[in-house]
Swiss-Prot record:
Cofactor: glutathione; Co(2+); Mn(2+)
Record-listed E.C. numbers: 4.2.1.44
InterPro entries, alphabetized: IolE (IPR023952), IolE/MocC (IPR030823), IolE/XylAMocC-like (IPR050312), Xyl_isomerase-like_sf (IPR036237), Xyl_isomerase-like_TIM-brl (IPR013022)
Pfam family, one: AP_endonuc_2
Any one GO biological process: inositol catabolic process
Gene3D superfamilies listed in its UniProt record: Divalent-metal-dependent TIM barrel enzymes
Cited SUPFAM superfamilies: Xylose isomerase-like (SSF51658)
Entry similarity comment: Belongs to the IolE/MocC family.
Pathway(s) where this gene product acts: Polyol metabolism; myo-inositol degradation into acetyl-CoA; acetyl-CoA from myo-inositol: step 2/7
UniProt-recorded name of the protein: Inosose dehydratase
Coiled coil regions in record: none
Alphabetic keyword roster: Cobalt, Lyase, Manganese
Domain of life: Bacteria
Organism: Geobacillus kaustophilus (strain HTA426)
Length: 308
């Protein structure tokens, strides 16, 4: 096959091997196996996962061994709870400083208040989303702006990750967040799979907020499973275990207009394949290989078409 030249910086999250949201999935994988497979497939970056050391020198040495960079880490926050805001910002600063020490330029932030699975104030059996009040939105925005200033002090950018099962999930909520936040402070992490899950056409979202997107997560969606999840109102973890997400090229999302727009934008941030599945069902190496080959092939064809 003709070798493709991909101008994008493509990484992959360890969640394909070891799941951070669902304990027990992929526990048998070691960081050496995961990193070696990433490197073998041509990925150049990853994100923080629970299988990696949290000691910067140790992690840096391990990543360097395989020629992999750390792109960022998902940081769950409770900025919507005004009573916890100061403590949350202290915790955020410690993680931001950690990422800075690791050479990262981005901090991924997601509000956990009111979420299905990740709000520590709620009981585990509470699997509905508790939507934010106006005052909670105000606190969230305040926290994001202050956290973004911390990032700026460190030469980093804050990117907000809208996410299924959280209070910034739907098209209306994503638009509200973008409207309420300062575009010079709060940037957007564009996630194709979570956009579709939340009812936002991924192409429309990309075009609408192209000037605010600084980080990309690529995942695909199995349409039949998404319909089942909506019909039966399944919670997020159950949806993942049912196989709602998969890698780009294996689901119903059309990535041609997405990559065409990224090329038009001269996008130069990270693109991370982040497609959580049960590794016992979807073999991580096989699916990571499938994703990389699909992306390389698609980008090659789009760039070749430009030259005609």
């Amino acid at each position: 096959m003709e070798k493709t030249v991909n101008p994008f910086r493509i990484g992959i999250a360890p969640i394909s091997w070891v799941n951070d949201d669902i304990p027990g999935l992929g526990d048998h994988y070691t960081q050496d196996q995961v990193l070696s497979e990433m490197a073998e497939l041509g990925y150049v970056a990853t994100e923080m996962g629970r299988l990696f050391s949290q000691d910067p020198p140790s992690l840096r040495a391990k990543l360097n061994q395989y020629g992999i960079e750390l792109a960022s880490k998902f940081i769950g926050v409770l900025f919507s709870d005004r009573s916890r805001l100061e403590e949350e910002l202290k915790t955020f600063r410690s993680w931001a400083e950690y990422l800075h020490d690791m050479g990262c330029k981005y901090a991924i932030v997601c509000e956990m208040g009111g979420s299905m699975h990740w709000d520590p104030r709620r009981a585990p059996e509470e699997k509905t989303i508790q939507r934010l009040t106006d005052s909670e939105w105000e606190s969230l925005v305040d926290g994001l702006h202050r956290a973004a200033h911390i990032c700026q002090e460190l030469g980093m950018k804050l990117v907000y990750h809208f996410h299924a099962g959280t209070v910034v999930e739907t098209a209306e909520e994503i638009d509200r967040l973008m409207e309420l936040t300062d575009p010079n402070l709060v940037h957007l992490l564009y996630d194709t799979g979570h956009a579709l899950y939340g009812g936002y056409d991924p192409v429309e979202l990309l075009h609408r907020y192209a000037d605010r997107i600084q980080y990309v997560h690529l995942k695909d969606v199995r349409h039949d499973v998404l319909e089942l999840v909506r019909r039966e109102q399944l919670d997020f973890r159950t949806a993942v275990l049912r196989g709602m997400f998969t890698v780009p090229g294996d689901g119903c999302i059309d990535f041609v207009p997405i990559f065409a727009k990224l090329i038009e934008m001269d996008y130069n941030g990270w693109i991370i394949v982040e497609a959580e599945q049960d590794p016992a069902v979807a073999h991580p190496y096989t699916y990571a290989k499938m994703a990389k080959e699909y992306i390389d092939r698609l980008v090659h064809h789009l760039l070749a078409a430009q030259k005609r």
